[in-house]
Amino acid sequence: MRHYEIVFLVHPDQSEQVPGMVERYTAAVKDSGGAVHRLEDWGRRQMAYSINKIHKAHYILMNVECGEEVLEELTTNFRYNDAVLRNMIIRCDEAVTEESPIMKAENESRERRNRAERRAQEAESAAEEVEDEESLDEEADDESSEDESEEA
């Protein structure tokens, strides 16, 4: 069996069908004794050029190990499925299991965004604590000034 990298683009109106399509394709690979080494759903993205006046598509990346028969079956499925706008199959020398550069960049930006949100929440909670302390101090000052005015 050989290793392949498969990328296919799904029509944006058919995005809800993507999990079912991926499940069918992975089942076809696994049923024949193959393996799916990497599966990434890149989501809906802007295409480099429009296809049939469509500017966005749902991108899926799969790294699989399978035989020629299964590969031909997948190719046929891609060709006759109207929801699949484009597909690309590349033969690889070995299984690729690490994250793709696109997913790495997305995960890094998500982590940065989460850290920034956490910092903002921490700063907000710290500011609220300071305000609470200040209001307590003001109340204590008001009470002490009232006590002093009563004594006089």
Swiss-Prot record:
One of its GO terms (molecular function) is small ribosomal subunit rRNA binding. Signal peptide: none annotated. Keywords: Ribonucleoprotein, Ribosomal protein, RNA-binding, rRNA-binding. GO terms for cellular component: cytosolic small ribosomal subunit. Residues 96-152 are annotated as: Disordered. This is Small ribosomal subunit protein bS6. GO terms for biological process: translation.
